[in-house]
């Protein structure tokens, strides 16, 4: 599946990082070289059909964190007027529950040039939990101080290997330290609130996987939100950037009222 944001046009330097040509281009796309999931494998996975102010529609991923809240990327809902949320199915545009957004909250300090603070919340009507619809756990206690380096985590989204697919895809990326990750980006892009994943094996998120979950599967723990890849391309082997969930727990609690 191709994940997220490829920074398309130019710093007009030798830098691999590029500013996005448009938010639309960053959100449409798929996971690369992933594996096919089945319904119920990732019961927290949300599919987001987003309508923008100019009536264009884009697709992103998200994570169910409560029966009324979805966590996603701010760049996904930039200029959004409404979101249709699909839950409980591995098939794109299908869901055991299909609901309309009630409220969209982007981080007030989101920077569309650097993708700093690239997190957003979507409030939805109450959904009932089932075998195929379950919330993902968020960090708490000592986990809030954990950088999760050198641990494999799972990223999922509706992607493509070599062909278009409507089936949820997933792959694994190794969490790497930010100093190593920062070597591949200009100064100021990789910050404390970024968590990076290695993609040197050719498996990466890309367009359309934006906002999706980055999860420690053995702990059912959400550690990242898909945010960006290098302007060199999704298959370049450059690290992928996620918004670090531990950096935003206070913000999530303040805006949802949920105590995790």
UniProtKB/Swiss-Prot annotation:
Inhibited by diisopropylfluorophosphate. Disulfide bonds join 60-76, 181-196, 206-234. Keywords: Collagen degradation, Disulfide bond, Hydrolase, Protease, Secreted, Serine protease, Signal, Zymogen. GO terms for biological process: collagen catabolic process; proteolysis. The active site is at residues 75, 118, 210. PROSITE patterns: TRYPSIN_DOM, TRYPSIN_HIS, TRYPSIN_SER. It is found in: Secreted. Its EC number is 3.4.21.49. Residues 17-30 form a propeptide. GO terms for molecular function: serine-type endopeptidase activity. It catalyses: Hydrolysis of proteins including native collagen at Xaa-|-Ala bond leaving an N-terminal (75%) and a C-terminal (25%) fragment. Residues 31-257 form the Peptidase S1 domain. Thermostable. No loss of activity occurs after incubation for 2 hours at 60 degrees Celsius. Inactivated after incubation for 2 hours at 75 degrees Celsius, however 45% of activity remains after incubation for 20 minutes at 75 degrees Celsius. GO terms for cellular component: extracellular region. Optimum pH is 8.0-8.5. Reversibly inactivated below pH 4.5. It is an enzyme of class 3 (hydrolase). Residues 1-16 form the signal peptide. This enzyme is a serine protease capable of degrading the native triple helix of collagen. Also cleaves the B chain of insulin at the 15-Leu-|-Try-16 and 22-Arg-|-Gly-23 bonds. Hydrolyzes casein, but not Px-Pro-Leu-Gly-Pro-DArg, BzArgNHPh, AcTyrNHPh, 2-naphthyl phosphate, 2-naphthyl butyrate, 2-naphthyl caprylate, 2-naphthyl myristate, L-leucine 2-2-naphthylamide, L-valine 2-naphthylamide, L-cysteine 2-naphthylamide or L-glutarylphenylalanine 2-naphthylamide. Belongs to the peptidase S1 family. This is Collagenase.
């Amino acid at each position: 599946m191709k994940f997220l944001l490829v920074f398309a046009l130019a710093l007009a330097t030798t830098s691999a990082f590029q500013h996005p040509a448009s938010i639309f281009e960053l959100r449409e796309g798929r996971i690369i070289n992933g594996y096919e999931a089945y319904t119920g494998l990732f019961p927290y996975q949300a599919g987001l059909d987003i309508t923008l102010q100019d009536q264009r529609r884009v697709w992103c991923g998200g994570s169910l964190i409560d029966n009324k809240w979805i966590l996603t990327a701010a760049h996904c809902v930039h200029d959004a007027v409404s979101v249709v949320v699909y839950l409980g199915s591995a098939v794109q545009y299908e869901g055991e529950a299909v609901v309309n957004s009630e409220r969209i909250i982007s981080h007030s300090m989101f920077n569309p040039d650097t993708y700093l603070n690239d997190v957003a919340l979507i409030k939805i009507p109450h959904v009932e939990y089932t075998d195929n619809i379950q919330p993902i756990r968020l960090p708490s206690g000592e986990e809030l101080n954990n950088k999760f380096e050198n641990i494999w985590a799972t990223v999922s989204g509706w992607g493509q290997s070599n062909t278009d697919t409507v089936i949820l895809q997933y792959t694994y990326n190794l969490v790497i330290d930010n100093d190593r990750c920062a070597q591949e980006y200009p100064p100021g892009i990789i910050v404390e609130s970024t968590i990076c994943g290695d993609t040197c094996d050719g498996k990466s998120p890309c367009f359309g996987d934006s906002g999706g979950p980055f999860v420690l599967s053995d702990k059912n723990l959400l550690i990242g939100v898909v945010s960006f890849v290098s302007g060199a391309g999704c298959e370049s082997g450059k690290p992928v950037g996620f918004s670090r969930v531990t950096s935003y727990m206070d913000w999530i609690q303040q805006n949802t009222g949920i105590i995790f």
